Design a protein with these regions (language model features):
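Core catalytic alpha/beta fold that binds nucleotide/phospho-ligands
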Residues: 1-204
Length: 204
């Protein structure tokens, strides 16, 4: 099963709320938040720290060669985090999992040429929702396998039009639109997805 957590981090745009959150973060996360120049990025990073603490307590983390985090002392729990705008999402599973959220992204011609096969480009056309759908699905796949951008997105071939379910060997996707912004999930196999709405109030 995949547990998917969806969090609105906008309350942390308030400096007083952010100040309340900081002491509950570990030293590394506090320093990271304080280094970030933009209020939006501070809120996102602090929210990630609060959510991970809520889910995993004071767990130790390790990182693969491309920077994907994992729990250092567990090989039966995997997670992946994404944030955009006011939203943070985290997917937790007993298998490798990738998740991506993207708020209001306009079509970017350079990204289209570099990341999408010509057939995908034709399907997207001028439709920004289709652009976001394919982009988040590709991102979720890259995050699942932990490749970063060492795997060119253009080499990830999706069915057109894309569908939920298996769309490549050892890759199963979900494209979820029931929240304020769409979220893509990718796992190596089909699983049940249990959704959880979390608030900053729950975490403080």
């Amino acid at each position: 099963m995949i547990h998917l957590y969806f969090l609105d981090c906008s309350p942390l745009l308030n400096e007083q709320e952010l100040a309340r959150a900081l002491p509950q973060l570990d030293d590394h996360r506090q320093a990271k938040v304080q280094r970030l120049p933009l209020a939006e990025k501070k809120a996102q990073s602090a929210a990630v720290g609060l959510l991970l603490r809520h889910l995993f307590g004071n767990a130790e983390y390790a990182y693969n060669t491309n920077g994907k985090p994992c729990l250092a002392d567990r090989n039966d729990v995997y997670f992946n985090v994404s944030h955009s705008g006011n939203y943070v999402v985290c997917a937790v599973s007993d298998r490798e999992v990738g998740v991506d959220v993207e708020v209001g992204s306009a079509i970017r011609p350079a990204v289209m040429r570099r990341c999408f096969h010509p057939i995908e480009q034709v399907w997207i056309g001028e439709d920004s929702e289709r652009f976001i759908r394919l982009w988040t699905m590709k991102e979720a796949y890259m995050k699942r396998i932990g490749s970063g951008l060492s795997l060119p997105p253009i080499d990830i071939h999706l069915s057109i039009p894309p569908t939920n379910g298996y769309d490549a060997p050892n890759a199963c996707w979900w494209y979820l639109t029931q929240w304020e912004t769409p979220v893509s999930l990718c796992s190596e196999c089909e699983q049940l997805v249990e959704e959880h709405i979390v608030t900053i109030k729950d975490l403080l």
